[in-house]
Structures are given as C-alpha cells and as structure tokens.
Amino acid sequence: MKKTLLAVALAPLCLPSQVFAADESSNDVMVVTANRFEQPIKNVIAPISVVTKEEIDAIQAKSIAEVLRRLPGVQVVSGGYGQATEVYVRGTTSRHLLVMINGVRIGSATLGSADFSQIPLTGIERIELIRGSRAALYGSDAIGGVLNIITAYQPGESVAEVTAGGGSDGFYQLGGSVAGGLGESGWGKIALKTEGADGFSARKEPFEQDDDGFKNSNVVAEVGTHVGDHWKLSLQGYYHDGESDYDDSYGAPHAQSESSLFNIAAKAGYSNDKLDSQFTVAQNQDENRNFNDVSSGSKIKTERTVANWQNHYQLTDGLELGGGLEWYRDSVSNTGTQYAEDERDNTAVYLTSIYRISDWQFEGSVRTDDNDSYGTNNTWQLATAYNITSELKVSANAGTGFKAPTFNDLYWPDSGNPNLKPEESKNYEISLSGTHQLLDWSITGYQSEIDQLIAWAPKDASNPSGDWIPMNVDEAEIQGIELTAGFATGMLYHDVSYDYLDAKDKGLDKQLIRRSKDSAKWNVSYLAEQWQLDVSAIYKGTSYDDAANTKKLDAYTLVDIAASYFVTDNLSVRGRIANLFDKDYVAKETYNVQERSYYATATYKF
C-alpha cells in the first residue's frame, strides 16, 4: 500500500493552517526514490511507504525507529533512545537496507550499515521506504530495501517555528526551524535541535545497573536558487553530534559512545520539457568512539566522497529512459589499530527504462559496479504491472542484489579476509492491489535467496578451535506475505497490515534471529475541530534470540496513544503515552525495555 491516503481522508476535517492540509489525491503524490527520478506514486510498481512531516508530528515519534516500526514489512528491535537499533525489512538485516539522506548514501564502511541512533528527525520533510531489492539502481546494500530521508526544502510559504518538550526518564528536546524564499528565485532552510534523556539501565543484571542516557545536537541546512528557466543549484548539509551510555558486554564500567555524522551535497540540475539531469558532489563523514573507565577506546572514521550524474528523458508519452554514472571513494581510519587497506573506489553505470502501453507498464534496470576491493558486480531488475480495471492492479517484480564486504570484514588486522566475495541475492515478488475512493489495499508475496552470507568461521575447517575469520559460508531463504489496507470509517482513518515471514538460515534450517513469523499493525487517526488523536497497536510474534533457536522470545503487543490540541493557528500542544498498558516484554535477551512513558511538547509557528 502507498501510505498517502491518510492526508486525503482527513483533509476535509482540517483547519486551514494546521495538519494534513493537502488538497491533492493520493495518486498525485510525487516520489523520487523508486526509480531515481520524480514520478507520481500511482506509477510506482515497487512497494513503497511515504511518511510526511505532518504524520511524524501527529504520532509524536522521538526517533526514526518509532516511525519505521509502524510500516508494513518492517520489524524493529531497539534498546531505546540513543541505543543500538536493528531494522529488519522483509526479514533482511540492517546491513541490507540502503540508507540515504536526500539521495546520498550514508553509513559506516567499517560496520556496513547506518547507525539509526544517529538519524534524528530534525528537519525531515518526508521519508520514503522501498521494500524489496533496488540494487540495479543503487548498487550495494539495497538487498532488502532503500530508505531515503528527505530534508530538502518543499516550495511553499515561508515558515518559522520553535518546539520544546519533555518526558519520562529525564527526556527533553528544544528545537527550531526557519524556511522560505530568498530573493526572487532562491530559497533557504535551517533546522536545529538538541535533545537528551537520563535514560534507564540498558541491560539486566548482572550488567551495570545505572541509567544509560543520551544527548544529541543536530543541524539541517539548505540554500538554493533557480538560474533562468532551466537550471537549479542547491547546497544541502546535515550534522549530528551525539553521546550515549551503554552497558558493555564485558562488564567495563561506565561505557560510553561518541558519534558524529556530517553530510554535505552540492547539486546542479537542468530540466526542460523532456530532460531532467542532475549532477551531485557529496561528502559524508561518520565517526564513532567507544570508551569506558578502563579504556579510552579508539576513534573509527569513515569518509565517503560521492559524484553522481543522473538523467531522465521522456522519449515519448509512453517511454521513459534513465541512467547515470556514479563514483564514490570510501576511506577509513582508526586511531588505534590500523587497517591493512584503508581506501577503495567504486565506479558504476546504471540504465533504466519504463514503457507504458494501454493498461500495461514495463520496467527494466541494469547496473554494473566495479570496486577496487572485490571486483565487478552486475545486477538487474524487471517489473511489470497490469491495470485489470481502473481500481485493480496486478504486478510482478524480479531482480538481483549484492552487499559488499566491509573494511572490518576484509582488512581488520590479524582477522580480516581479503578474499571475501560480496553477498548476493535473488528476489521475486507478485502483488495484487486496489485503490478506491477511501480504501487502499494490497496483498504481496515475495521470496529472497541470499547466498555467500558473511559469517565468522574457522580459518581451517578441520580445526574449529583455531583462528576464526569472516568467510562466505551462510545462506538464507526468506519468504513472506504482506497484507495492507487503509480505509476510513466515519471520522476515523485506519491503517492496518499483517506480515507473515519465514526467514531461515538454510545451513541450520532454523529461523533467523529476532525475526517474528507473524506481525501485525493497526494505526488509527482521528481529527476534528481542534483535536487530533493517533493510536497505534503493534503485535510482534514469537522469535528467537540465537541461531540455534533455543532462546525463545515471547510474543507481545505494544500500544501507543498521542493527542494534539491546536490552541490557535500558531500554537499547538501535544501529549503522548508510549507503551500505554506498561507491557513487560523482551525484545532482545539480557536487555531492558522502556516502561510506560509520558511526553509533552509545545510548538509555536510564526
């Protein structure tokens, strides 16, 4: 289901300057992630979820994890704000989810994934999540999906606002933003936020029983201008600086983590009636240091420089062509032990086409990546959709993907394996969906086969007590069914989903850890006069915390409730209760979870 009907269903009930003030139908919503160019969501074959700033404000999410866990096909395991977070999209790990900010990939080249605790909600205008492989367009990491966090300024009237709030466990937040036009053809935006909490003990006894808190500061900024009728220039920046406490697995006292993320991108775009072309140069830096009372630790840093030239051409009314060149260089450094190799380049070319004739749509994409460390990888994707009626559509999708070995896998001193190959996947899905005036629904079946999974194994198979190194030894098979529906009953809007997931380690014939076979979500929204209400219930079925499936994690249901009151056109106050029924559950063995908690915020718009 395309998560856009909510704004449409509630728009007639809204006050003019408050929330969900869109007047366009859900099919007119534009997205950019599915095929690397802007297109109406109705033309996207891939399963996509879109979450707007207004929806994030309504549910009063405090982290990106709280937004993602409401979406179909997603399971989230988190230790709370500022703690390690795992995101499983269709049963794949966080390492198999490509994360981008404004279309530029982020994440650590040493760990191989983005740190979701470093991605606060500051300045976010929209989130787009593609479920399923998109490697034929984006290359490595996009086996399970693509998450694009968009902070880019959305044209419209100028706006300025300040927000302050607090809550349980010493939580606080203070932020503000200004956005609007600059001169006759320019625009600018800046958003700042600081937040933190005293927290609670991340782990159970016998681990250290102290509060594990966090504090973050974040800045999002953008300036841009139109040059003539065809050119557009912009500079976008994002900065995060954070500290968090955690409980060390080895019992070291007062373990802490310091992290920073810096992303800047310069973009030049040209467009006319037929052609859209954009050139991007970006720099991304990711730093992390873990330390405690015993050790000062070492700082591990990833620097990624990116250059990308992408194009989209409307050849005829029914035929669109796209393609581009992408180059990026990953560099890593460690103030402690040095890597055997600390730099690698990746050069890629990609092509895509979309053809529509009558009630049919066909898509095809191919990409070639050439990398200094692991050679050449070719990926492809084919998709088709048929409109059975104006309200009913059937679609199918097939493709391949890969995940590059990390610097830790390849070059960590004394334990890296420079002979590693990328993990590879084959992905298939078929879907039936319907779009009606106040009802969207879909049923999707999918299968993914992932080979050459990297795992620790004995260097000498005949000597399991000897040295262990990363090796391509595992295989996984993932099958699932997604059911989604969005509909209105009177003044209530319902967004429901059910996921059946069978994610197996083929070698062990066991379920992959922390993936529930059954999960369900029900989100209800209500808006009338000056009140807005959001209730969510998330069910996560039984799962296992170990590869042998001996440590069972019981099923649980969490309910959150959020309410907003619009005092005036400028002032709003909001309150939220998380874990409404104070459910005591286990998301990860030996880790605590947050009890019932309360939050309140106030926002004033100028």
UniProtKB/Swiss-Prot annotation:
Intervals of motif TonB C-terminal box: 589-606
Signal peptide: 1-21
Membrane topology, as annotated: Multi-pass membrane protein
Keyword Ion transport: yes
Record domain TBDR beta-barrel: where: 157-606
Primary location class: membrane
Domain TBDR plug positions: 40-152
Annotated gene: btuB
Protein name: Vitamin B12 transporter BtuB
Ion transport in keyword set: yes
One cellular component (GO) term of this entry: pore complex
